[in-house]
């Protein structure tokens, strides 16, 4: 088993190609988003590695283009666990890099994101968590991301979100998808891998990234580095806050109980004081739907990035990702919402 074959199957599956040659249409019927086609994904795959065009078999005689076997997914999950354990809890990331927010099983939109930002290794990425649940293609989404992580371990980074936790994804869709398409055993192995994922990233020492936000317990970045793994997400404390907390403008104090029932909300002054103390330019986090796909807070010292357009098929939000260049200048690329949401499976 190898990542080349898994990526090939995820990007070039004939069932994907038939659907992906269509162009997403906006509310006015005009094409308002680049088509994501078999040709673009074929070029992306070939730019990453050489792969013979003849389909291989998996030992049972079944062509691998039909989909990933449970053994292949299990291999991908276990290899990723070992890689996560070999890297720190606070990963150090070099610019340039694209920073992406929640994806939530919206696999088609993940391909749109790569179509706009460049498929690895043509661009470097850090994703801020919440790969599974809510969307109907969590398995495609997490498998492609893990395959890219294994293929490009020093330029492709995946942080843990609050949905990379068994108590959450047991309820919001990922457990049911694993059980229906593979097995409960595989879901448990995903859980073991999620428990080893890093929870924060630092871009060139100036941009701190996490899924949720700050914590009243965070007084030294070495606290993150010293977190032991594997670990579940506790109900309170540093890990919980990094994955669950939110900024808020409606604050009578610096910290207040979060309406989610978990963790805290924090004020603008908390962000400004934190950035000054640690000599940071920006905090980049995800975790909340924002209409434009990105939204600033605290005089542009914190930004929320959300990369799942038309979230849950219930919102008209755009998705977005942030591009950080070599000089740490930041810009944003939007993934426009569409009424025509394409879905295809491996």
UniProtKB/Swiss-Prot annotation:
Q: Which reaction does it catalyse?
A: O-phospho-L-seryl-[protein] + H2O = L-seryl-[protein] + phosphate; O-phospho-L-threonyl-[protein] + H2O = L-threonyl-[protein] + phosphate
Q: Which residues form the active site?
A: 163
Annotated binding of Mn(2+) 2, by residue? 130, 162, 211, 287
**Which EC number(s) are documented for this chain?**
3.1.3.16
The cofactor note reads:
Binds 2 manganese ions per subunit.
Enzyme type, top EC level: hydrolase
The cross-references to CDD domains, in alphabetical order and at most eight, read: MPP_PP1_PPKL
Q: Does the keyword Manganese apply?
A: yes
Keyword Hydrolase (UniProt): yes
Q: Which UniProt keywords apply?
A: Hydrolase, Manganese, Metal-binding, Protein phosphatase
Q: Which residues bind Mn(2+) 1?
A: 102, 104, 130
- Specify the superkingdom: Eukaryota
Cofactor(s) the record lists: Mn(2+)
Which Gene3D superfamilies did the record assign? 3.60.21.10
Q: Which InterPro entries match?
A: Calcineurin-like_PHP_ApaH, Metallo-depent_PP-like, PP1_catalytic_subunit, Ser/Thr-sp_prot-phosphatase, STPPase_N
Q: For this protein, what is any one GO molecular function term?
A: metal ion binding
A single Gene Ontology CC annotation of this entry is: cytoplasm
Q: What PANTHER family does the database record attribute to this sequence?
A: SERINE/THREONINE PROTEIN PHOSPHATASE, SERINE_THREONINE-PROTEIN PHOSPHATASE
The entry's family comment says: Belongs to the PPP phosphatase family. PP-1 subfamily.
Other observations noted: Trypanosoma brucei contains two PP1 genes which are highly similar.
Name this polypeptide is given: Serine/threonine-protein phosphatase PP1(5.9)
Q: Which organism is it from?
A: Trypanosoma brucei brucei
